[in-house]
Amino acid sequence: MTGGISPHPINATPEIQEITNTVKEQLEKKLGTNYSIFQAISYKKQLVNGMNYFIKVKTDNGYDHIRVYEAFKGTPNLVSVQQHKSLEDDITYF
């Protein structure tokens, strides 16, 4: 059953870091930058026809929120990004 975004952030797991690593190049290309720091901190998820992951990522410039869609048995793809976030900023749907 599909639904809303999970209410509380979850600490990033190795699986979430792997998803984050998979879309790093997509994000760098989109933003025209290269990151030496790209660490998943926490995330929320939303079950759709696949899974949306809303991930707080620590970067060289602070924190970004990225939205990644992963189809069932598919490859993760970057959907969107919110830049200039802080560690304290809540992860919300975007």
Swiss-Prot record:
It is found in: Cytoplasm. SUPFAM superfamilies: Cystatin/monellin. Keywords: Cytoplasm, Protease inhibitor, Thiol protease inhibitor. The record marks 3 as: Reactive site. It holds the Pfam family Cystatin. One of its GO terms (cellular component) is cytosol. GO terms for molecular function: cysteine-type endopeptidase inhibitor activity. SMART domains: CY (SM00043). A motif (Secondary area of contact) lies at residues 46-50. Coiled coil: none annotated. Its main location: cytoplasm. One of its GO terms (biological process) is regulation of protein metabolic process. PANTHER family: CYSTATIN 14A, TANDEM DUPLICATE 1-RELATED (PTHR11414:SF21), CYSTATIN FAMILY MEMBER (PTHR11414). Intracellular thiol proteinase inhibitor. Belongs to the cystatin family. This is Cystatin-A3.
